[in-house]
């Protein structure tokens, strides 16, 4: 490109006839300076011959001639003559120059042409570089940020303009709306928790107290509320174990996907005050929590035991008023006898210690089953002879087979034969017991000492018994909100020998503050009250729900008989099955079991619905039927079937498909021909298998075919269709 541009410039220079009068030495000097000024640009060498000028002249002449020929067409013959003359003159001049060749310096002409070409190329390249720089600078000016030179001093950095960002304006209205929505969501969650707990427990005041105390606790931590520390932490705002069990059962039924972690979170939410109460106990809290048996705290217990006495402890102290000829029954969770004679005082003390240790290590259920009553040694008051070995063996056997806790029975007074069964755990409360070391020794050695056992308060008594035994004692019930001074109270720190002939009543105290015990004056007079000490009839006050279980339990025993049954009090809590009945149990020494041990396991308090009965049929694997009476008959038949398990132990009644499978397997083992075909993997038709099993037991007709096929698949028995022949 540079060479072609230089060639064009040179041609224009020759055509215009411009001549350079610069001396040869000066041209050479300029050419040398131009060489030093260049930035390394190399120009290709051009070899000019001696007759370059002649060639150029001839070329110029030919060009003029060519132009002349072109103009002839336009101007005519006159122009042709003029151009021919000019051509002739040019040729003569050229000839003259060539003839004077000796006088002309050829080096000057050659150097002149080279210098012109070199200068034009250098100038053009520098112009191109300058244009590129301008273009780049123009592009850089489009940037928002100012160009910073690396070599620039730091003092000049501050002089440049720096754009400041304008702060964004916040919408105060939007923030206010967000705060309102957040407060609404918090209040909504609190209302939901409040309503849920009210539905589950039915105690509005307790739920409100929980929410209120929890809010005070949170505000006291954050420092928002200064008077939060003045709020008293009362144990009446927490739920007991039985209340929490009831709430958890309702949650399980309503929310089937509830996990154990959710239960723990809800329990911590409800009983959040428990840890705080343990850290900072007050007088009321200490009176409701049992003293720890830790050895490290033994000295503390001995020093401060006298300052932690509650009214319930003072009223419940029996150490100074027990009579030697009176007997006090107690509950035996380990299956021992219920009642002991009071003459053996040392044995009674040991028994009370066993009960206290058992109750402190086990969680006593409030509603206990009556199945433990089946084989227990119940003998009448005043009976001092030992039970027979046969009775002892039977009791131990029945206790081992019993899977349900014993029935709680309590007996009070003399010559009345009254026993009371409790259906709620609210009556079982731990009391701070009074250490015997702070009391003076008692004269009567037959009186048992105070031990750390759970006291069972009297549930109810007939009015006649109260009139006979408690003429001088007023009715004291802390749960009813009334209190009257009684002159027969015994102090635990004084000698109680002056009141040995007195009778004391159990004072029921309520942990939650809600009265649940019956008013003794509201109990009607029972039609049977004349019980002899030597008789073997015992009176029990029991709920309707437990009465049904008691009837089923005594069916298998011949030594216990239910003779009388009377309703004492109607429903008190608004729940079905909570009515109270007074029943009389007759105990005999006949220990033989009844001939028909079958018990209908499907007996319920209410008549089950048809859908529930069909579910029971499907669970066992029996054939479906339409009528409810037929379903009940089939279930009754299933409850009387005798099965043999893998350990060759007989069981009465089937309640699942696995027990039906054991029943069918037992029938197959009794048929040698059928057993041989099964062992040899010979195919058996379904009809043949059912017929052979039916011959052994007619209960097979009630079993569904699908259940039988499932049993054959489990054992690997080859079954084929009935239409195929052998």
UniProtKB/Swiss-Prot annotation:
Enumerate composition-biased segments (Basic residues): 161-173
| Listed GO biological process terms | DNA recombination; DNA repair; DNA replication
UniProt-annotated location(s): Nucleus
- Which UniProt key words apply to this protein? DNA damage, DNA recombination, DNA repair, Nucleus, Phosphoprotein
Q: Where is this region: Disordered?
A: 156-187
The domain of life for this entry's organism is: Eukaryota
Recorded GO terms, molecular function? 5'-flap endonuclease activity
Q: Where is the signal peptide?
A: none
Query: What Gene Ontology terms describe where this protein resides (cellular component)?
Result: Slx1-Slx4 complex
**Modification note:** Phosphorylated in response to DNA damage.
Q: Which family does it belong to?
A: Belongs to the SLX4 family.
Its quaternary organisation is:
Forms a heterodimer with SLX1.
Q: HAMAP family from the entry?
A: Endonuc_su_Slx4
Q: Its function? A: Regulatory subunit of the SLX1-SLX4 structure-specific endonuclease that resolves DNA secondary structures generated during DNA repair and recombination. Has endonuclease activity towards branched DNA substrates, introducing single-strand cuts in duplex DNA close to junctions with ss-DNA.
Under which name does UniProt file this protein?
Structure-specific endonuclease subunit SLX4
Native species of this protein?
A: Candida glabrata (strain ATCC 2001 / BCRC 20586 / JCM 3761 / NBRC 0622 / NRRL Y-65 / CBS 138)
């Amino acid at each position: 490109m540079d060479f072609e541009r230089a060639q064009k410039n040179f041609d224009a220079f020759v055509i215009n006839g411009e001549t350079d009068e610069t001396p040869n030495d000066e041209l050479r000097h300029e050419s040398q300076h131009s060489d030093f000024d260049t930035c390394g640009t190399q120009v290709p060498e051009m070899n000019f011959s001696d007759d370059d000028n002649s060639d150029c002249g001839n070329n110029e002449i030919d060009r003029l001639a060519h132009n002349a020929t072109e103009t002839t067409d336009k101007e005519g013959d006159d122009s042709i003559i003029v151009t021919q003359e000019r051509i002739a003159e040019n040729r003569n001049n050229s000839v003259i120059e060539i003839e004077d060749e000796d006088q002309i310096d050829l080096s000057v002409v050659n150097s002149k042409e080279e210098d012109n070409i070199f200068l034009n190329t250098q100038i053009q390249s520098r112009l191109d570089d300058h244009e590129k720089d301008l273009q780049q600078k123009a592009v850089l000016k489009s940037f928002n940020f100012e160009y910073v030179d690396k070599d620039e001093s730091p003092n000049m950095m501050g002089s440049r303009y720096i754009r400041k960002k304008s702060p964004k304006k916040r919408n105060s209205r939007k923030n206010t709306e967000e705060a309102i929505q957040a407060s609404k969501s918090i209040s909504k969650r609190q209302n939901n928790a409040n309503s849920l707990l009210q539905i589950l427990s039915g105690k509005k005041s307790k739920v409100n107290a929980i929410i209120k105390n929890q809010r005070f606790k949170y505000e006291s931590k954050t420092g928002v509320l200064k008077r939060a520390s003045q709020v008293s932490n009362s144990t009446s705002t927490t739920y007991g174990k039985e209340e929490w069990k009831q709430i958890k059962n309702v949650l399980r039924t309503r929310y089937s996907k509830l996990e154990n972690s959710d239960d723990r979170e809800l329990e911590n939410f409800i009983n959040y005050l428990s840890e705080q109460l343990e850290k900072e106990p007050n007088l009321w809290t200490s009176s409701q929590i049992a003293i720890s048996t830790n050895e490290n705290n033994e000295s503390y217990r001995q020093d401060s035991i006298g300052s932690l006495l509650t009214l319930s402890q003072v009223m419940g102290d029996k150490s100074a008023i027990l009579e030697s000829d009176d007997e006090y029954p107690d509950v035996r969770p380990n299956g021992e006898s219920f009642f002991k004679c009071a003459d053996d005082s040392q044995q009674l003390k040991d028994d009370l210690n066993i009960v206290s240790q058992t109750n402190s290590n086990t969680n006593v259920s409030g509603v206990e089953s009556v199945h433990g009553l089946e084989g227990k040694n119940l003998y009448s008051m005043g009976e001092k002879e030992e039970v027979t070995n046969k009775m002892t063996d039977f009791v131990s056997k029945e206790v081992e087979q019993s899977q349900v806790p014993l029935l709680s029975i309590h007996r009070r007074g003399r010559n009345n034969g009254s026993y009371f069964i409790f259906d709620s755990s609210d009556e079982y409360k731990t009391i701070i017991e009074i250490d015997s070391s702070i009391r003076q020794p008692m004269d009567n050695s037959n009186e048992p000492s105070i031990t750390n056992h759970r006291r069972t308060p009297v549930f109810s008594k007939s009015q006649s018994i109260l009139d006979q035994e408690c003429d001088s004692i007023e009715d004291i019930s802390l749960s009813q909100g009334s209190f009257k001074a009684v002159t027969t109270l015994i102090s635990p720190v004084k000698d109680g020998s002056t009141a040995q002939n007195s009778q004391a009543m159990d004072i029921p105290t309520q942990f939650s503050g809600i009265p649940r015990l019956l008013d003794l004056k509201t109990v009607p007079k029972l039609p049977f009250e004349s019980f002899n000490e030597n008789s073997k009839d015992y009176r029990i006050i029991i709920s309707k729900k437990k009465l049904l279980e008691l009837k089923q339990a005594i069916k298998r025993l011949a030594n216990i008989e239910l003779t009388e049954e009377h309703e004492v009090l109607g429903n008190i809590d608004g729940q079905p099955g909570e009515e109270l009945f007074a029943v009389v149990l007759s105990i005999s020494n006949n220990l033989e079991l009844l001939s028909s041990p079958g018990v209908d396991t499907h007996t319920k308090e209410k008549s089950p619905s048809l859908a529930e009965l069909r579910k029971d049929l499907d669970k066992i694997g029996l054939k479906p039927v339409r009528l409810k009476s037929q379903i009940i008959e089939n279930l009754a038949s299933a409850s009387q079937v005798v099965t043999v398990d893998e350990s060759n132990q007989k069981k009465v009644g089937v309640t699942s498909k696995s027990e039906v499978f054991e029943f069918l397997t037992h029938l197959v083992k009794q048929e040698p021909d059928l057993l041989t075909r099964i062992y040899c993997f010979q195919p058996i038709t379904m009809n043949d298998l059912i017929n052979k099993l039916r011959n052994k037991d007619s209960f097979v007709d009630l079993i569904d075919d699908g259940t039988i096929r499932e049993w054959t698949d489990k054992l690997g028995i080859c079954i084929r269709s009935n239409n195929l022949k052998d």
